[in-house]
C-alpha cells in the first residue's frame, strides 16, 4: 500500500484503518490485510493509562511507532503527531514528523482544520505524506468543552467544509472525519478529491477506522456509541488468567508435559 493507491481507492473501494500500538497487534493487523495501521496518540488512554491524549509525548509515540513497524514490516503505517509536536512552529513540525519517518512511519496524521494548512503544506513539501483530521479533534478537547459531535450548526458545517478543502489544497492525501454528523461527512466526502476516513461520522465516508481496544472489546468500561465490538477479548483474557491461577493454586500446572527431565528432548519455546 502507498499514498497513490489509497487516493485511487476513493469512491471505488472502502479503506480500512485500525489503530495498533505494539508489534504483536501490528502483525495481526497486517495478516488481516488491513489497509492502514494508525499508531494513534490514543495510545495515551488505551495503553499508557492517561485520562486523554494530551500527556502523550513524542518519545512515547516514537517507541510505539517503531514497534509497530517491526511487527508489520509490509504495512502502511501512519503516526499521530501528539499534542504540541507541531503546533509551536513549522520547524518543530518538520523536525518531529521527520523523526517518525526515520523510525518507520509512512506518513503522519495532524489534528486541526484550515488553521494548520501551512503546516500540512510544508510537511508535504519536505517529503512527508500527511493525513488530516477534522471534526472532533481530541487534542483540542478543552477548546470544544468535551467530546461533542461536530457539524450540527451551520457555522460548524462551514468550518469543516472549508477545512477539508484547505487540507486537500495544501497536499493532504486523506482526511479523518471524527464524530461529524453523517450529512456533513457525506457533503465533505463528495466535495473533495481525496479519501475521507470516518470514525463516528456515518456511512458515506471513503473508509472507516476503529480503535483496537474498542473493536476487540478490551475495555469493559468504555463502549463508544459509534463503535462496534467484534470480539469480547476482555472476558476471554480474564477467563484464561483465572484458569491459570486456579491450576497453579491447585498444583495442576505445570503437568508432566510441561516440565524438563534428564530424558527430555527438544528445546524451549521462549
Swiss-Prot record:
Its main location: cytoplasm. SUPFAM superfamilies: Phosphoenolpyruvate/pyruvate domain (SSF51621). One of its GO terms (cellular component) is cytoplasm. CDD domains: KPHMT-like. Signal peptide: none annotated. Binds 1 Mg(2+) ion per subunit. Its EC number is 2.1.2.11. Mg(2+) binds at residues 41, 80, 111. Catalyzes the reversible reaction in which hydroxymethyl group from 5,10-methylenetetrahydrofolate is transferred onto alpha-ketoisovalerate to form ketopantoate. Belongs to the PanB family. This is 3-methyl-2-oxobutanoate hydroxymethyltransferase. It comes from Thermotoga neapolitana (strain ATCC 49049 / DSM 4359 / NBRC 107923 / NS-E). The lineage of its organism: Bacteria, Thermotogati, Thermotogota, Thermotogae, Thermotogales. The gene is panB.
Amino acid at each position: 500500500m502507498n499514498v497513490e493507491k489509497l487516493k485511487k481507492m476513493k469512491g471505488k473501494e472502502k479503506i480500512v484503518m485500525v489503530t495498533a500500538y505494539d508489534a504483536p497487534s501490528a502483525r495481526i493487523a497486517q495478516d488481516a490485510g488491513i489497509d492502514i495501521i494508525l499508531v494513534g496518540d490514543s495510545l495515551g488512554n488505551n495503553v499508557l493509562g492517561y485520562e486523554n491524549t494530551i500527556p502523550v509525548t513524542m518519545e512515547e509515540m516514537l517507541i510505539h511507532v517503531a514497534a509497530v513497524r517491526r511487527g508489520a514490516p509490509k504495512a502502511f503505517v501512519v503516526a499521530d503527531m501528539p499534542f504540541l509536536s507541531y503546533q509551536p512552529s513549522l520547524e518543530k513540525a518538520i523536525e518531529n514528523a521527520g523523526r517518525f519517518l526515520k523510525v518507520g512511519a509512512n506518513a503522519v496524521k495532524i489534528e486541526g482544520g484550515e488553521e494548520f494548512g501551512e503546516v500540512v503544506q510544508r510537511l508535504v513539501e519536505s517529503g512527508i505524506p500527511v493525513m488530516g483530521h477534522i471534526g472532533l479533534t481530541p487534542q483540542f478537547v478543552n477548546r470544544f468543552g468535551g467530546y461533542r459531535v461536530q457539524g450540527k450548526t451551520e457555522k460548524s458545517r462551514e468550518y469543516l467544509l472549508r477545512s477539508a478543502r484547505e487540507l486537500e489544497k495544501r497536499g493532504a492525501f486523506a482526511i479523518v472525519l471524527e464524530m461529524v454528523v453523517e450529512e456533513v461527512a457525506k457533503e465533505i466526502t463528495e466535495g473533495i478529491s481525496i479519501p475521507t476516513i470516518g470514525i463516528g461520522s456515518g456511512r458515506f465516508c471513503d473508509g472507516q477506522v476503529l480503535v483496537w481496544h474498542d473493536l476487540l472489546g478490551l475495555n469493559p468500561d468504555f463502549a463508544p456509541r459509534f463503535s462496534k465490538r467484534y470480539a469480547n477479548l476482555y472476558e476471554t483474557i480474564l477467563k484464561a488468567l483465572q484458569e491459570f491461577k486456579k491450576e497453579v493454586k491447585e498444583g495442576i500446572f505445570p503437568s508432566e508435559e510441561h516440565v524438563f527431565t534428564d530424558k527430555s528432548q527438544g528445546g524451549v519455546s521462549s
